[in-house]
């Protein structure tokens, strides 16, 4: 037991409760990780305020997203900051805009707070508009994350179908990890 995922993609309205939960968690499990995964810049204003599950709303602004990151760090005081940004949308070579801006905000704010950041790597497809990544696209996501200072790489595989051939795209993260590990 290394910790617990408390909430995925909370909104600003949840931060006070998360702060109280973290204080209790730290009291009883001081050596464990209180883990919350945060939203990307393409979340709507409603999602950043109310949480991802609410949906709807207008496109958010960079200012609101920066407030979201800063408020979470200052109120919850996490051991690390985790977020997701799934850039490989629609057909190749489309990449969701804001990928580097999002990473820059997270890298900057976590550096100020002296905490590491982790990021999720898109490793599969879902919902019709998110494509299956190639090995090169997974490598690109991992290497750009490391270049920005990410200390944790997580792979979002959703419901990757089982295949034990070693050639299925579900094996791409293993290959990337081997390459990074050999450096």
Model regions and ranges:
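Glycan-processing catalytic domains of CAZymes
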Residues: 1-183
């Amino acid at each position: 037991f290394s910790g617990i995922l408390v909430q995925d993609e909370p909104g600003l309205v949840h931060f006070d409760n998360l702060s109280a939960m973290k204080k209790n968690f730290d009291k009883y499990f001081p050596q464990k990780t209180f883990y919350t995964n945060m939203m990307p810049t393409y979340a709507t204003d409603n999602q950043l305020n109310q949480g991802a599950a609410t949906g709807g709303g207008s496109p958010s602004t960079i200012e609101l997203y920066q407030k979201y990151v800063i408020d979470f760090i200052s109120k919850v005081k996490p051991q690390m900051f985790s977020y997701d940004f799934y850039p490989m949308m629609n057909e190749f070579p489309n990449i969701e805009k804001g990928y580097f801006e999002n990473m820059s905000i997270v890298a900057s704010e976590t550096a100020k707070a002296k905490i590491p950041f982790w990021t999720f790597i898109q490793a599969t497809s879902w919902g019709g508009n998110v494509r299956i990544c190639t090995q090169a696209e997974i490598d690109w996501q991992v290497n750009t994350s490391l270049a920005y200072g990410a200390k944790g790489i997580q792979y979002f595989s959703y419901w990757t179908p089982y295949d034990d051939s070693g050639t299925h795209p579900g094996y791409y993260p293993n290959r990337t990890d081997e390459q990074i590990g050999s450096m």
